[in-house]
Regions:
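Active-site neighborhoods and metal-handling regions in enzymes and metal-associated proteins
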Residues: 1-283
Length: 283
């Protein structure tokens, strides 16, 4: 009301937040360039992860080292979200069965956390041979939230893990092939469910005990913007939209596998913003 009083000649419309979010879903060229620069710095940090791992580390110790890498590459250290009830630090590291713990927020995966007051990410457990872990850090380097997840393993994993990881890469490839202006957001979710069901991993997809009902989300000044790749989301992709695509599978006794990359919609399709190797990296 105070803002409206400053502009007496204007009409105040309801649902202003929704209108602003819709407008912000399409980025300007300057904003897109910020994402590109952020993606380069984000990848540089992730590429150094093998160099900071030491046998006998806990998930917390390794997470701290990765956060340090992110800050040294220029990450601002702030993880901005839409909605007052959602909070986290720079991101998460989920190892082994800790990835089966449900998320308290609208995240793909959760984690027990170090304390019940913040049940998210690392729980202080030792990283074990035969375990996978997923690094999912929000790359806020220039005020715009890039999003990228990569999977690492302590030694070799069971063959099932590599098969499941490839299924996630197949989902990414299928979605990217169809991601063009005019494509409907819910169709991408349905496509992912079809692929993962045929592959036999539907029970493990997007969570174990609690499943996320999306495979992607818009990113920008906040980590959870429009569009959302989820059921019943009829919004169409438009050039300039930027979103994270994150098909993930959790395997009991092994850990998480999958992929997350940030993409910008162009006139012809999509451009990948997070350029980093996508296979499981063995430590």
């Amino acid at each position: 009301n105070r803002l409206a009083a400053c502009f007496p000649e204007t009409e105040v419309l309801p649902c202003g937040t929704a209108l602003i979010r819709k407008a912000r879903s399409v980025k300007t060229e300057i904003e897109i360039e910020m994402f590109r620069r952020s993606g380069i710095a984000h990848a540089k940090a992730y590429e150094q992860i093998p160099s900071v791992y030491r046998p006998g580390m806990t998930d917390r110790q390794l997470s701290i080292e990765i956060e340090r890498l992110m800050r040294l590459e220029g990450c601002l250290g702030i993880f901005r979200t839409f909605g007052q009830s959602m909070e986290i630090f720079m991101g998460s590291l989920l190892a082994g069965d800790n990835a089966t713990a449900p998320a308290p927020y609208d995240f793909a995966l959760g984690g027990e956390g170090l304390d019940p007051s913040l049940p998210i990410s690392v729980n202080g457990a030792l990283l074990q041979p035969g375990q996978s872990f997923m690094v999912d850090m929000g790359g806020n380097f220039y005020g715009y939230m890039g999003d990228m997840s990569r999977v690492f393993s302590i030694g070799k994993l069971p063959e099932k893990a590599y098969v499941a990881h490839q299924v996630c890469l197949d989902i990414q490839e299928a979605v990217v092939e169809k991601a063009k202006p005019g494509a409907v957001c819910e169709d991408f979710y349905n496509l992912a469910i079809d692929i993962v069901t045929k592959a036999g991993f539907a029970d493990n997809f997007m969570g174990a005990t609690q499943k996320a009902k999306f495979i992607g989300h818009g990113i920008g000044l906040e980590i959870n913007e429009m569009p959302v790749l989820a059921p019943r989301m009829k919004q169409e992709l438009e050039p300039g939209m930027v979103f994270a695509l994150e098909p993930k599978i959790v395997l009991l006794g092994i850990g998480p596998v999958g992929i997350e990359n940030s993409w910008v919609v162009t006139a012809e399709g999509v451009e990948k913003l997070t350029l980093c190797k996508e296979e499981i990296v063995e430590l």
